[in-house]
A protein has these predicted regions:
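Non-catalytic peripheral regions of nucleotide-handling enzymes
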Residues: 1-81
Length: 81
Protein backbone atom coordinates (compact mmCIF):
# COMPACT_ATOMS: atom_id res chain seq x y z
CA UNK A 1 0.00 0.00 0.00
CA UNK A 2 1.50 3.40 -0.93
CA UNK A 3 2.36 5.68 1.93
CA UNK A 4 0.02 8.66 2.19
CA UNK A 5 1.54 11.98 3.02
CA UNK A 6 -0.13 13.59 6.01
CA UNK A 7 -0.69 17.30 5.85
CA UNK A 8 -0.26 19.09 9.13
CA UNK A 9 -3.25 21.00 10.42
CA UNK A 10 -0.91 23.89 11.14
CA UNK A 11 0.85 23.94 7.78
CA UNK A 12 0.57 27.39 6.15
CA UNK A 13 -1.55 27.56 3.00
CA UNK A 14 -0.95 29.71 -0.08
CA UNK A 15 -3.19 32.73 -0.38
CA UNK A 16 -3.67 35.55 -2.89
CA UNK A 17 -2.70 38.90 -1.41
CA UNK A 18 -2.72 42.30 -3.09
CA UNK A 19 -0.54 45.00 -1.61
CA UNK A 20 -0.20 48.76 -1.71
CA UNK A 21 2.88 50.72 -2.79
CA UNK A 22 4.74 50.01 0.47
CA UNK A 23 3.97 46.28 0.46
CA UNK A 24 1.16 46.19 3.02
CA UNK A 25 -1.78 43.87 2.26
CA UNK A 26 -4.96 45.48 0.90
CA UNK A 27 -6.89 42.29 0.05
CA UNK A 28 -6.66 38.61 0.99
CA UNK A 29 -8.37 36.29 -1.50
CA UNK A 30 -10.32 39.33 -2.80
CA UNK A 31 -11.59 40.29 0.70
CA UNK A 32 -10.62 43.84 1.72
CA UNK A 33 -8.29 44.42 4.65
CA UNK A 34 -10.02 46.67 7.20
CA UNK A 35 -7.05 47.01 9.55
CA UNK A 36 -3.50 45.85 10.13
CA UNK A 37 -3.39 44.97 13.82
CA UNK A 38 0.29 44.08 13.95
CA UNK A 39 3.29 43.59 11.69
CA UNK A 40 6.58 41.85 12.45
CA UNK A 41 9.64 40.41 10.75
CA UNK A 42 11.16 37.02 11.54
CA UNK A 43 14.74 36.33 10.50
CA UNK A 44 16.11 32.96 11.56
CA UNK A 45 18.59 30.30 10.49
CA UNK A 46 20.76 33.08 9.02
CA UNK A 47 23.79 30.89 9.63
CA UNK A 48 22.50 28.11 7.32
CA UNK A 49 22.48 27.79 3.52
CA UNK A 50 18.70 28.37 3.62
CA UNK A 51 17.96 31.27 5.99
CA UNK A 52 14.37 32.09 6.94
CA UNK A 53 12.97 35.59 6.40
CA UNK A 54 9.24 36.20 6.78
CA UNK A 55 7.22 39.39 7.10
CA UNK A 56 4.01 38.73 9.09
CA UNK A 57 0.78 40.74 9.24
CA UNK A 58 -2.11 40.21 11.63
CA UNK A 59 -5.14 41.49 9.71
CA UNK A 60 -8.82 42.25 10.24
CA UNK A 61 -10.76 41.50 7.05
CA UNK A 62 -13.99 43.10 5.83
CA UNK A 63 -15.86 39.81 6.40
CA UNK A 64 -14.95 39.91 10.12
CA UNK A 65 -12.17 37.34 10.10
CA UNK A 66 -8.84 37.89 11.83
CA UNK A 67 -6.00 36.24 9.93
CA UNK A 68 -2.23 36.11 10.02
CA UNK A 69 -0.53 36.17 6.63
CA UNK A 70 3.15 36.21 5.85
CA UNK A 71 5.38 36.83 2.88
CA UNK A 72 8.18 34.38 2.28
CA UNK A 73 10.33 34.86 -0.80
CA UNK A 74 7.83 35.75 -3.55
CA UNK A 75 4.74 34.03 -2.13
CA UNK A 76 2.08 34.79 0.46
CA UNK A 77 0.76 32.26 2.96
CA UNK A 78 -1.93 32.28 5.62
CA UNK A 79 -1.19 30.81 9.03
CA UNK A 80 -4.11 28.76 10.34
CA UNK A 81 -4.49 27.47 13.87
Amino acid sequence: MPERRRQSVYQPQRVRVRTDAVGEPTTVDAVAVEAIREEWLVEDRWWTPEPLRRRYFELVLADGRNVVVFREASRWLVQRA
